Amino acid sequence: MTVIKRNGSEVTFDITKIIAAITKANESVDESIRMTPMQIQRIAESVEFSCLKMNRSPSVEEIQDLVEYQIMAHGAFEVAKNYVTYRYTRSLVRRSNTTDEKILSLIECCNEEAKQENANKNPVVNSTQRDYMAGEVSRDITERILLPQEIVEAHREGIIHFHDADYYAQHMHNCDLVNLEDMLQNGTVITGTLIERPHSFATACNIATQIVAQVASNQYGGQSISLTHLAPFVEVSRQKIRKIVEAEMASIGADPGAEKITELVEARLREEIRRGVQTIQYQVVTLLTTNGQAPFITVFMYLGEAENEREKKDLAMIIEEMLLQRYQGVKNEDGVWVTPAFPKLIYVLEEDNITEDAPYWYLTELAAKCTARRMVPDYISEKKMRELKGDVYTCMGCRSFLTPDRFTDAGIGNIANAKNYQPGKHKYYGRFNQGVVTINLPDVALSSGGNLDKFWKIFEERLELCHKALQCRHNRLKGTPSDAAPILWQYGALARLKKGETIDKLLFNGYSTISLGYAGLYECVKYMTGKSHTDPAATPFALSIMQKKNDKCAEWKKAENIDYSLYGTSLESTTYKFAKCLQRRFGIIEGITDKGYITNSYHVNVTEEINAFEKLRFEAQFQHLSPGGAISYVEVPDMQNNIPAVLEVMKFIYNNIIYAELNTKSDYCQVCGWDGEIQIVEDNGKLIWKCPKCGNTDQDKMNVARRTCGYIGTQFWNQGRTQEIRDRVLHL
């Protein structure tokens, strides 16, 4: 068994340290009231037993809490008092020097929490370490100076989660839809250099990747671009290539005829599209931003965005090439094709591609093959999204969705000064999310003790606490000058404001959103009703919880003219933190707090047996009540030899739910070449990854790709998320 120290490093559990600490406190009291060595030994053994029952690595603080409890349980109150006093004195010393130990542990690569905090960041490399070091300083300033203490304490206790505190010291927003069309068609500026409208598709792709990197370096969340914004440059290249081919034919005195020339032009055009798409794929996974990671980028593929049939056909060629290259994958350092984490791909299911007789059905078949092998694309239903939101648009990065455009309907106009603004047309590209605060629903339930009246009272209080935290997020952005991130606010990615102008007008009237997140609906309902929220007897209670959160968002929105929106939090590493906090506050409760994770958002619990179609049908009603963002998934086996089944799931998505994905496995052992599933096994109380063929357990010598929270993770996960991945049951 191992222990997580305060600086995040991991050490072997040592019972003698507990005995020594209790003995020291014991010796500080009068001899007449001291405990015997046998009592101290029993306390230490009891603490060790409690830690083993956690099925995870306990923190030093948790161990000390257990020691305090056991000393008092033995009636040694004076000893307990001295033990508490010693802890408090030590905490004061640590508080006076809040970041040094954590930063040093990051530099020396012994911080286990940092190693597993983000499934797409490698904390060993210098660039990532610099980001983490800056994050520690930001988090420290945030907790000591910038945030109200009640929010800091609620965050520490896992009552709420104040997302991305490591970026809060700066005036940065979360995620967005990049207005790539405006930047490519009307020019932009990158690091002081004017970038004019590109004269070929390949150049447009190259500029797009530079924009993506610049945007990622000026925010902390994900971003999305649309292939539709690249499609007009296919025709630009077509005309350019035609002139070159005609000149070549003339130079040699050849006249192959218009049909042959067109064939040659289209062949060269296809090659340019291949190179352009390859530029996007390889630039995205090899670029490093100031965040110490590849850009968290989503590529949107929606035929319905095309302006005309010619552009739609050109867009289809780009989508086809994007899918073909993702199906192939990228090579790892051993030259083996593996699954990359980025870009995330989203493919829209629509009338033109959802049936066998549709003109673009071939793209849907290719998408199905790609999903079966590489876990992307994910799918948005044009039909369901238009029904529920009125428009069809992509999420910002992983799952965060904008609210439907209300500022255009209100006649507010082009507040971002975009050069591609069309009066009366709803606007989505160029909009963004201000930030997220998540409520821990199981904590609300457990705090109520199962009393329904008490539950709703506590729920109301916690929601208002989240509201206060979200107002802090909003106010941190108010007054931000456009100069803070010129690529975003001055040169078209989000707006074209004047130098020195603040971004304030973009924070109101629904131009941007701010998200109330939630997690653990399953555990919350299970504790309050004794049943899963899939049980018809418990579903109405689950839906009433969802409706209450939406009602609060509507109330805040009306009062402040800010688009608060309910968001199904993705909880990448926070699932482990919430689980540990619940165990510390309420103990181990079977089916509620007995794991190292809590269930994401509204999802069916990962251990619950349910088929793919029933899961999607059930979760659709909750996705409708998460307008600020949510995604559903089904866990499937290797489907590469059963593409018709994948297509059936996709058709079901089209008819039943806005946004969903299929999860499979994509692994490779660099020691023996095994390309089946790398397994999760327990070793000395810790979950590790192990090749079933050769027994390799070295994470540096294997490629493992798993769906983490909408994105694909490839850098491994903390113990809580790893346990959740292990516990997932198949739905097909």
What role is predicted for each listed range?
Residues 14, 681, 686, 708-711:
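Conformational switch/transducer regions in large eukaryotic molecular machines and scaffolds
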Residues 273-277, 281, 526-527, 721-727:
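Metallocofactor- and cofactor-centric catalytic cores in central/energy metabolism, strongly enriched
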Residues 23, 467, 471, 522-526:
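Amphipathic, well-packed alpha-helical segments that form the structural scaffold of globular domains
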Residues 1-110, 726-731:
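Charged, amphipathic alpha-helical regulatory modules used
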Residues 89-510, 531, 535-697, 703:
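Conserved catalytic cores of very large enzyme subunits
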Residues 301, 514-527, 547, 707:
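Contiguous, well-ordered alpha-helical segments that form the cores/surfaces of helical PPI scaffolds
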Residues 695-732:
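Long insertion/accessory domains within large nucleic-acid-processing enzymes
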